[in-house]
Amino acid sequence: MTMAGNFSPLVLVGDSDRVEAEAVGAYLDNWAGKDGLRLATADAIKAILAGATRLAGRIARGSLPGDPGKLVGVNSDQDQQKCIDVGSHNLFVELLIAAGAASILSEEADLPVAGKADGLIAVAIDPLDGSGNVGLGAPLGTIFSIFPADTAEPFLQPGNRQIAAGYVSFGNSVDLGFSVGEGVIFATFDPASGIFHITRRNVTLPERTSDLAFNASVQRHLSAGMQAYVNDAFLGKDGPRGRNFNMRWLGAAVGDMHRIMQRGGLFFYVNDSRPGYEKGRLRLVYEANPIAFLAREAGGKATDGSRSILDIVPQTYHERSALVFGVAEEVDILGEYFAK
């Protein structure tokens, strides 16, 4: 039996040979109409999706053409940069400039990259979230935020000025979650057609959750209030919370975001006593902000433990922040412990 030749996917009972769900591009065109700012936003999202399809293809090939996890440098925060980090950055910057963005802020560059002088939007992006998972089969993602480019420093605006935000999750399928301020939409990439098709609209988080996502290995470094939150949850139905909790931790914010948006849950990565973690670890502008925008659009919340993420005015491009997001009720409960 030969394994060479054209790839033909398994067809399951009940599968259709046609995908009739609306394409994301068509949705964006209808949403944008003739409005200039909306058209610029739609073009930027389309550019990101074009880049995501190319990135997905490279991820799928693993180490066959070369080692994507090869270390090639460090960024401004001394985080190690892999070959695929730099390649992803270059890809998205090139496509976003071609799409007319005024400027692009990437995790992999110290300063924003200038684009079209009269562009209407500014795009903040983490080209490849979770690159430590490269080669392990664990989740990877791209996450982005779009702001109006109507100030001298568009990336130092509070998150509540975002026009749109979204992420692409590279897992056993390539999935998109995004919002243009009219609810959260899910879509999946169809490799047969090269198109993202909408699979769910008006995604809504549940009212209650018993799923927690956090790095349990750092519990001893958390504040007394946060340690009490974890301990009370782990006591389950015999403790003050009165019900059992499950733990989920994927090691990539986009992966945890995608799971929580589908199943509910609460994620936290807050400040702790370790050197370098005093203000949290995730980036406010291009990680916490888009997550907070999507959480709000799905009926959830996102805070730094006490303040709404969307109300925080960044002071620097790569500012770090504590982040708590997910089901609104649980975010509020954690906030009570956080304040202790």
Swiss-Prot record:
Keywords: Carbohydrate metabolism, Cytoplasm, Hydrolase, Magnesium, Metal-binding
Classification via Pfam families: FBPase, FBPase_C
Metabolic or biological pathway: Carbohydrate biosynthesis; gluconeogenesis
Annotated binding of substrate, by residue: N215
Catalytic activity: beta-D-fructose 1,6-bisphosphate + H2O = beta-D-fructose 6-phosphate + phosphate
Coiled coil stretches, renumbered: none
Superkingdom of origin organism: Bacteria
Residues the entry annotates as binding Mg(2+) 1: E107, D126, L128
Segment forming the signal sequence: none
Cofactor binding remark: Binds 2 magnesium ions per subunit.
Cofactor: Mg(2+)
One GO molecular-function entry: magnesium ion binding
GO cellular component, one term: cytosol
InterPro entries (UniProt xref): FBPase_C_dom (IPR044015), FBPase_class-1 (IPR000146), FBPase_N (IPR033391), FBPtase (IPR028343), Fructose_bisphosphatase_AS (IPR020548)
GO annotation, biological process: fructose 1,6-bisphosphate metabolic process; fructose 6-phosphate metabolic process; fructose metabolic process; gluconeogenesis; sucrose biosynthetic process
Location within or outside the cell: Cytoplasm
List of residues binding Mg(2+) 2: D126, D129, E287
UniProt EC number: 3.1.3.11
SUPFAM superfamilies: Carbohydrate phosphatase (SSF56655)
Assembly with partners or alone: Homotetramer.
Similarity comment text for this entry: Belongs to the FBPase class 1 family.
Protein name in the entry: Fructose-1,6-bisphosphatase class 1
